[in-house]
Structures are given as C-alpha cells and as structure tokens.
C-alpha cells in the first residue's frame, strides 16, 4: 500500500494545492481520466470543510490528507482535528463568527456535493476530530515502462 | 491559476465574465464583485462562466447569495455555461432549478421570463 501524505496549514489558499496533488497521485495510481474531475472536486470540498472547521474552532494544527494507493482502489482521507460533542456541532470562533448560519450552510453543501459525487464515502466525527474517507476504483499500471 | 473578473453593460443587463477557479480562496472576490454591482444599482446580472475551470460549493454559495441580493430588488441572475464538468455540480446540488442557465451571453441577455 503506497501512501502520499500531505499536511497543510488551515488556510483557503492551500486547498488548491491539495486538489492538484490529489489529482496527480490519483492519475498515477490508475484512476480513470474521466473520474479525475470528481476526485479534484471531492478532495477540494473535504479540505475546504476541514479548513473551515479548524478556523472556526481556532485550531492551529494542519489539515491532514492521505492519498492511499491500493490494489483495486484509490482512497483519500481528509482529517480535521476539530472536536465535536455532537456531529456537526461547532465551537464558536473568529472565522465566520458574524454569520455562523451561512458557514454551516456551506459546510452542508460541501458534504452534499461529496455524497453526490462519490459512491464510496464515509464521514465520521468524534471528540478528537473528523475524517472523510472516499474511494474510487483504479487500474494500476501493469508494469513500469522506462 | 487565480480568478479573473470583468464586467460590461449590455442594455439593462450587467455581464460579469468570470475566468479561472472559483473555490474557498477566490470565492470572496466574486462575492465582493456581486455585492458591489448590486449596491451600485445593477440588479439584472448575467454571470458568464465559460472561462471557469473549477467551481466548488463555496462558489455555488456565492452565486446563491448573489441571486438572493438581486431578487430583493426584483432583479435577476442568469448563468451562461456549456461545460459539462461545471453543469454537473449544479445538477447534483439541485441548483439547475434555481438558476436559469443559458448557452450564450446573447441568449441570457435577451431572456425576460
């Protein structure tokens, strides 16, 4: 199982980097070209959500993205460290504090896009943070051609 | 790749041509542009998305916010988009029912319903 791990400060400008890296690794692992747009969008949504959660909870830890190449599938895990006492519940903070409803609506919309795009998706959250795991089928390259 | 924005007036419509990527980083610029237009009295907007390479839910949120603002002034917000990858995002979120989506700026500018 080959893995690429990416950690980035919870800043909106780094979400694009995460999309680019995820798409590059997905392509390399043999994910169908037609599906790469979906991978890009889904990982962007998951990272956007994690950045929002870190900022609204005042968490300085980076957002973590794992890109996992397996034999028959390619998986992406996006983890945040925002604690929830109940799913979706947030700690008030600086980011979007003036309009918490709008932020929560965008968060919901991000999840709606992910579940609309990806067939194989798991969303979990607990007191130590949340995790979105998404998988796509792949066809790994049969052999390395120099 | 960043976000590019330019506006022009066609009759009583204001066409906003958007290019590049609309995501969590760039969407605030689009939001500012739409808010500014409405504050300046432009209530009939056509957002031309033909140059957009990427759109996420943050961008959708900004467009919905724009629609809400123009509707408060009995205005309209129409989209121009032919790209399947972008249209798909409107479909899976059900927003094709919310936004009139046109195939050309000419068509959007002429539309009245």
UniProtKB/Swiss-Prot annotation, chain B:
InterPro entries: Anti-sigma_ant, STAS_dom, STAS_dom_sf. One of its GO terms (molecular function) is identical protein binding. The modification Phosphoserine is found at residue 57. Transmembrane segments: none annotated. It holds the Pfam family STAS. Keywords: Phosphoprotein. Residues 3-112 form the STAS domain. Phosphorylated by RsbW on a serine residue. Signal peptide: none annotated. The keyword Phosphoprotein applies. Belongs to the anti-sigma-factor antagonist family. Positive regulator of sigma-B activity. Non-phosphorylated RsbV binds to RsbW, preventing its association with sigma-B. When phosphorylated, releases RsbW, which is then free to complex with and inactivate sigma-B. This is Anti-sigma-B factor antagonist.
